[in-house]
Design a protein with these regions (language model features):
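Short stretches within intrinsically disordered, low-complexity N-terminal or propeptide regions
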Residues: 5, 68, 129, 201-202
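Sequence context surrounding c-type heme c attachment/ligation sites in exported
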Residues: 29-150, 154-190
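A short beta-strand segment in extracellular, disulfide-stabilized domains
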Residues: 84-86, 209-212
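Residue-level detector of functionally pivotal "anchor" positions at catalytic/ligand-binding pockets or at interdomain
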Residues: 189-211
């Protein structure tokens, strides 16, 4: 069977329609690809995603149904010290044992102060177009990731962190059944609390947002 080659005005029209259809498919695929492979540094409004949140899920509305939690956060940091963080993002309905979303993603930033690292099996990446923001590289079925943060070598004052987390239904497209929330916290500068005054300087804590 030989291939048929369209020529003339009709052929040009067919080619234009085919190209337009392929272009439209690509555009429709971008949101799903962008979210499943991790959010970009900037959201759809042109603001840092970690600090301003997601503008594509749940019509851009923040929701307490999305629980965002970070464990291993120190009260204050010691210069060059390494801290182990665990990040969890979940649907509060799922945490309560009810039907809810079971997949999740996130992005975290320290304002490029200190350094994040992680093991290869964590499916993390530097967020697209950012210097040091970290996000998931694949949507997680557990919603739990482990990474380390190394404090800067010099006293940089109090360091502020922001985390945006998505709890999603896994259908590959942003929608009303996907929920996101934002968490911010601060790690105090060295010497904020003297060791002799409060043993809490040696402890880490869990910080979270959302209803559960």
């Amino acid at each position: 069977m030989s291939a048929r080659l369209w020529r003339g005005p009709m052929g040009s029209q067919v080619l234009r329609r085919t190209a337009l259809a392929l272009f439209t498919i690509c555009l429709l695929s971008l949101p799903a690809l962008g979210n499943s492979g991790g959010p970009p540094y900037l959201n759809g409004d042109g603001n840092p995603t970690a600090e301003y949140g997601c503008s594509c899920h749940n019509n851009g509305q923040i929701s307490d149904r999305a629980v965002v939690m970070v464990t291993g956060v120190p009260i204050q940091y010691a210069t060059s010290e390494i801290y182990d963080f665990t990040i969890q993002v979940a649907d509060s309905h799922t945490l309560a044992g009810d039907d809810g979303n079971t997949q999740a993603g996130f992005v975290i930033t320290s304002g490029d102060v200190g350094t994040f690292t992680w093991q290869d099996d964590q499916e993390l990446r530097i967020a697209e177009d950012s210097q040091g923001d970290v996000s998931h590289s694949e949507t997680s079925d557990t919603g739990i990731w482990s990474l380390t943060w190394q404090a800067p070598a010099a006293d940089e004052g109090d360091i502020h962190f922001w985390v945006a987390g998505n709890s999603v239904n896994g259908d590959g497209a942003p929608g009303d059944d996907d929920y996101w929330n934002m968490l911010s916290f601060t790690i105090n500068a060295p010497g904020t609390i003297e060791n002799d005054d409060n043993a809490a300087t040696l402890e880490t804590r869990t910080v979270s947002v959302g209803s559960y």
